[in-house]
Amino acid sequence: MRFTKMHGLGNDYIYVNCFEETVENPSEVAKKVSDRHFGIGSDGLVLIMPSERADFKMRMFNSDGSEAEMCGNAIRCVGKYVFDRGMTNKNVIRVETLAGIKVLELTVQDGKAKLVKVDMGEPILKPENIPVNSDKEIFRTEPVEIDGKEFKVTCVSMGNPHAVSYVKNVDIFPLEKIGPKMEHHPLFPKRINAEFVEVIDRTTLKMRVWERGAGETLACGTGACAVLVASVLNGVSERKATVKLLGGDLIIEWNENNNHVYMTGPAVKVFEGEVDLNEL
């Protein structure tokens, strides 16, 4: 199987061009190739496929083999992959995901895609659609107890579910302890991605993320979008802000006119290779 390793802010995936390759049982393949000791090493596997509804289709699998609806960092790399390889010459690309069709706008330098702006669509705030076990109109600054400590949580879906809470110092926050307990909290029937945020100022937010099925990662694009939306709802941020993640910065904007959230950030190719899956 031929592959390309790429990352968006250190959120790294193995990309396979399914116009040329067939991947049987992608869930198992994801587990094998993601292993950082016995495989290639990544946060998951992304398949780039033909689509009947858009220019391309993306399927993505976490390192534990579970299929995810959408990943902002991964989809930016899909945009770079198809443009740099000449699979399209368009600067605006439509990509089908399990969370709907996403529109990508590429900034091209020297014939290569450098920055990708993604229309992430409208945030979902109704608890039943996130899903959260709550009959509230929106789940904003609601108390969630973990280990006897109360967190004020705001929930947003960007095609996948997020629980956002605020902390004084995100660098020393015990994420590896609290993150998995938030992910598996009974309030969240499909588990949840947990973001912990420090507000630097009204246009700068600093976050760490515990991703459902992957643990702490260097960056999560949908998580950064959810953080911006939650921060606007909570009155602590402007509608456009820089979100600082461990792997780097994303610029997130929640447009007032069309209610869409836009994410702009880099996409980087690391290397290409070939792997015999029977040997893993």
Curated annotation (Swiss-Prot):
Pathway: Amino-acid biosynthesis; L-lysine biosynthesis via DAP pathway; DL-2,6-diaminopimelate from LL-2,6-diaminopimelate: step 1/1. It is found in: Cytoplasm. Its EC number is 5.1.1.7. Pfam families: DAP_epimerase. PROSITE patterns: DAP_EPIMERASE (PS01326). Its main location: cytoplasm. GO terms for cellular component: cytosol. Coiled coil: none annotated. It is an enzyme of class 5 (isomerase). Keywords: Amino-acid biosynthesis, Cytoplasm, Isomerase, Lysine biosynthesis. The active site is at C71 (proton donor), C220 (proton acceptor). SUPFAM superfamilies: Diaminopimelate epimerase-like. The record marks H162, E211 as: Could be important to modulate the pK values of the two catalytic cysteine residues. One of its GO terms (biological process) is lysine biosynthetic process via diaminopimelate. Homodimer. Catalyzes the stereoinversion of LL-2,6-diaminopimelate (L,L-DAP) to meso-diaminopimelate (meso-DAP), a precursor of L-lysine and an essential component of the bacterial peptidoglycan. Belongs to the diaminopimelate epimerase family. This is Diaminopimelate epimerase.
